[in-house]
Amino acid sequence: MIGKIGIIGDVHSEHLRLRQALGWLEQQSVDAVICTGDIADGQGCIEQCWRALAGAQVHTVAGNHDRWLLDDENRHVRNAQFRTGVSAEGLAFLQSLPKIVRLETAGGELRLCHGMADDDMAKVWPGTETTAT
């Protein structure tokens, strides 16, 4: 059963910061680390990012930037990365990421997603009402 959880989100290829965060979370003796996606599109190294996440067995979901990279969409965004710059293993890792991960925790079921449920672009703001499950 998972008790203490470390959360990472919107990595955006920041491999140095990701490594630092994973190291800090390891020092905190968390039971699991989860990542809300968006590994792609940033100034750092996407290869080092996906390898670090996989190596640390981080529960990771796909974000909209990961989907955009795989589908070759919105490549006009700042610091966009392209499929040609990602290894076959890296592309396979990104393609394997689910939209939703469910984990049993000491506090009950945790549902991890990038947006809301399977909509990676959905946002929640104060006052927003939703029926997403």
Map each language-model feature to its residues:
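Mobile, glycine- and charge-enriched loop segments
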Residues: 1-12, 31, 103-110, 115-118
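Core catalytic region of metal-dependent phosphoesterases/phosphodiesterases
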Residues: 2-96
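Acidic, His/Gly-enriched loop-helix segments that form or flank divalent-metal centers
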Residues: 80-133
